[in-house]
Amino acid sequence: MIKLGCTLLALTLTACTTVAPPQGSERGSGSVVSDRVKQLTRAVQWRPVATIPIQFNTHHPQGMVKIGDFFYVTAVEIRTPTKRFPQLQGGYDRDTGEGQGHVFKFDDKGKLVSDLLIGEGSVYHPGGIDYDGRYIWVPVAEYRPNSRAIIYRVDPSTMKAQEVFRFADHVGGIVHNTDDDTLHGVTWGSRRFYRWTMDSQGRVTNADVAPESLRKINHSHYIDYQDCKYLGRREMLCSGLNNYQSKKDGPRFALGGFEVVDLTTNLPIHQVPVEQWTESGLPMTYNPFWVEPTAGGLRAYFMPEDEKSTLYVYEADIR
């Protein structure tokens, strides 16, 4: 279910009525995507079908959803890079740096339509995002692990953000489980999972619980999730990557892939590499992605590059 007809109660709480997602919505295709992703193997060939130059500075892109003919991408504009401490200070390995979070809306030609500034102070790093048929869910965190985050929902029709809750850890990606009306987050490097419950009025009921009591360990290690989408049936699809070295001082090899994760167990139920790279060697799953069904397979959108980005479109046939 999704939220509509919301009445503002406080800065971070809302009372909402619930209705079913509209027929034919992007969320409604999730089960088809799930079934087809589970048929992907290393033998399935992804073929490039389009490259769309993005006509504005994308800074450092993070998450993406596609709604109709428009794309919504989160990005972090780094103004002062973080600096590592010689040793931990207050539990942190680096300072906060300075920056600005963005939610970009652009069309299928790569032209910027809207730029929503998002975040607050040192909380300027948006992460992976999800669309539930009504709202885009956006986590914004400090640019360092074990920090803090603000969770927003954005109305794509107005490009206005509403704060939902705050949490005492770095939340780098979020999905809305509309079957159970719960939110699920991943942390820095996706090493931890969180599950937040909501009451009948859409208010998060366990945001003030100590993170140590809520977190679950991610037992999948071959990639770090960068962006995730809810598929329905208590499953989410995540994309990500990891870097590997055959020698300590040798070159690094970046491998990306997809994982379908069971949100009841927090365990992957299907894993597959995506063996596609940019000319510079970045895996396509480096950061934002979106997947949708085609007549006989899947279409995937990737935007791995910073600043001067290209939207890469691939298709795969599922036999």
What kind of feature is each model-predicted range?
Residues R47-I54, K111-G119, K160-F165, D208-N218, ...:
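A short beta-strand motif characteristic of beta-propeller blades
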Residues S220-L267:
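Loop/turn-rich, solvent-exposed surfaces of beta-rich toroidal or solenoidal domains
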Residues F106-G110, V154-M159, M198-G202, L263-N266:
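Short loop/turn segments that connect beta-strands within beta-propeller blades
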Residues T74-E98, A141-P145, G240-L255, L311-I318:
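Short, conserved, GDST-rich strand-edge loop motifs in beta-rich repeat architectures
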Residues G68-D69, G133-R134, D179-D181, R233-E235, ...:
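Short coil/turn segments that connect the beta-strands within blades of beta-propeller domains
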Residues H59-G63, G121-G128, A168-T178, S220-K229, ...:
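Repeated scaffold domains used in trafficking and secretory/extracellular systems
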